[in-house]
Amino acid sequence: MRNRILAVLGIIIVYRFMAHIPVPLAQPTQLKQAMNQVLTQNAFGGFLNLLSGGALVSMAIMLVGLSPYITASVVMQMLTKAIPRMEEMSQDGESGRRRINQWTRLLAFPLAILQSIAYIMILRSNLLSGTSVASSMTSTQWLLSVSAMTAGSMIAMWMGEIITEKGIGNGITLMIVVGILSQLPQTLGTIWKAMTTVNGKPFHVFNWFQINGLNHMVTWTVIILAIVSLLILYALVKVNEGQRIINVNYAKRVHGNSQYGGVTSIIPIKLITAGVIPVIFAVAFLALPAFAGQLMVATKWHSDLGRNLILWFQRGSATSGAVTGWAALIYPVSYFLLVIIFTYFYTSIVFNSREIADSLQKQGGFIEQIRPGKQTEKYLKHVVNRLTLFGSIALGLIAVMPFVAEYILSDFGMGTMASSMSIGGTGLIIIVTGALDCIRQLNSRALMVSYDEYK
């Protein structure tokens, strides 16, 4: 167990170190100054910086990150449901799953190359236009930059799989969690900057002590939001840990002088069987239209359509709503619907009612008042669908709540802090679900080993 934890920590340290190795576009200081200017003026760039775990601000080789692997996973899982041969392969035990995983890796490689080229084109033409970085790029720098970013993406994918196989928890989710947590100091700094002001008054804390130079309205807003965030965190943990227990009885069997069976076991069905994957898939899927729009504008190919895609799929807020009207609602509404769709989709992959029903029938198990076989399969599907309906709606509501907070805060002139809250909402779901998954696996592994092995 100790070796697993140390292996995970070592991989995470290397991953965060690589997130600060710049691509060979220009001098590192020149790149960082240009990207800092970009992130203060471009909302899309700020969102990409979050998803890359801060790699964008340094133009690091980990800029593309896990995005190609996530996209390839979504494509392969959709093909698994659409193509009967692949569905049979996915049900063919460990060997079938290994072949599908290998195809996913092979698909991620060309996607990483394409995304690396697209990122550089977008950054060069849109985000870094007017800077010396955009005008001094040679063909050699193009080749080296694309190669470095593709290699970084493949290394990140390999690290995630190593954590999954040799470590604790889901490696891809854990690396995304680490990337989001790395942005926490910057988010807290933004909130503190919004709270402090030159003409601020002393803020008394229960008459115990006072903090000078605070804007009272912003401070009370932050306190209220902190309380609301804790309540959302509590609700998220409850929803994630909620489950339905189905009792399974086993018929008695006599073999010689021995009697088998006659016992009762349970099938725990979680409220959100899919875990955090629907949120990750929804965020990755929603980033594609804006990404494509930026690429179209950069290449001047159907620029009007590209600008519309950027407009329609930017993160909605009260500030953008004043400019774009109904278009500001497209992102949060699409986000809510995609979370529900991907929750159902991934649940159908993770929880196979037919396999469970067949396994129970072969072992002589049955659910009370439900006949084995087809009736058991139908009953399990009914229970899972009802739980998934409630769980997906709850997860979707939690996901879009920060957008409501952003809308309210923007009315008080706190748009910058509101943007941080909106990004933090997606991050909160990923962090909580990923942490609970790690804790669950730690507990299960701790029960499987002796004291000497645990040490």
In which residue ranges do the predicted regions lie?
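N-terminal cationic and glycine-rich segments that engage phosphates or anionic surfaces
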Residues: M1-E88, S95-K455
